[in-house]
């Protein structure tokens, strides 16, 4: 169980690397304002991600784990399936949410492709806030998804791991404190966002979770 939980922890953490990298790639390739700053990345890696990730360490073993043969001694912890799941499936979904949130603010203020995008001021700060909050929103879906590798989370009990739930509450408190505390806004380059913006971002939370549930179903069905 310890080995499996370390893999779940790693998958959860690695997935957020993609929405942290994609904004820099778009900044360089498409000459748009930087959608996510270094300080905002640190807010994720050293702040919002920590408590939910630790909650995964308390995840009970999946059903049937004792029926499986022992893993080879030379089997790596960071294997190809783990990296593919984090970097090629979960991470890209998070990156879509991150960038969608960023452009959502510009579209709200009348921007259309071809126009210059402001790289300072309230519009820009609000847009980068959406990028950060988009990562947090999808990481909530991700921490539920990472509770199992193959089995459906609905089968193991959606709210069974209380530490994961406490981690999510902690994550929401941290991101809310960063976004709505004036002196922290200045440090992290953030601006307040409203219920409509939160609703847009949290629409991606079940999308990621359900897409991962679908992937697990395919794995169970075809690679049992």
Regions found by a protein language model. Give the residues of each.
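Membrane-embedded transport module
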Residues: 1-151
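C-terminal transmembrane module of polytopic membrane proteins
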Residues: 15, 57, 133-224
């Amino acid at each position: 169980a310890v080995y499996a939980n370390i893999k779940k922890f790693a998958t959860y953490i690695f997935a957020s690397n993609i929405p942290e990298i994609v904004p820099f790639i778009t900044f360089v390739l498409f000459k748009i304002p930087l959608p996510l700053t270094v300080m905002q990345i640190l807010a994720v890696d050293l702040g919002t991600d920590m408590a939910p990730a630790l909650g995964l360490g308390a995840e009970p073993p999946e059903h049937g784990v004792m029926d499986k043969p022992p893993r080879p001694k030379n089997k790596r912890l960071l294997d190809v399936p783990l990296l593919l799941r984090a970097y090629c499936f979960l991470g890209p979904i998070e990156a879509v949410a991150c960038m969608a949130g960023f452009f959502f603010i510009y579209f709200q203020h009348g921007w259309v492709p071809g126009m210059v995008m402001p790289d300072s001021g309230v519009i820009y700060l609000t847009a980068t806030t959406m990028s950060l909050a988009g990562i947090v929103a999808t990481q909530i879906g991700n921490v539920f998804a990472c509770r199992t590798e193959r089995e459906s989370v609905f089968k193991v009990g959606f709210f069974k791991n209380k530490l994961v739930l406490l981690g999510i509450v902690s994550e929401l408190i941290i991101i809310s404190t960063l976004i709505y505390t004036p002196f922290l806004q200045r440090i992290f380059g953030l601006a307040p966002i409203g219920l409509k913006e939160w609703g847009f971002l949290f629409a991606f939370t079940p999308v990621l979770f359900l897409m991962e549930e679908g992937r697990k179903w395919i794995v169970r069905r075809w690679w049992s």
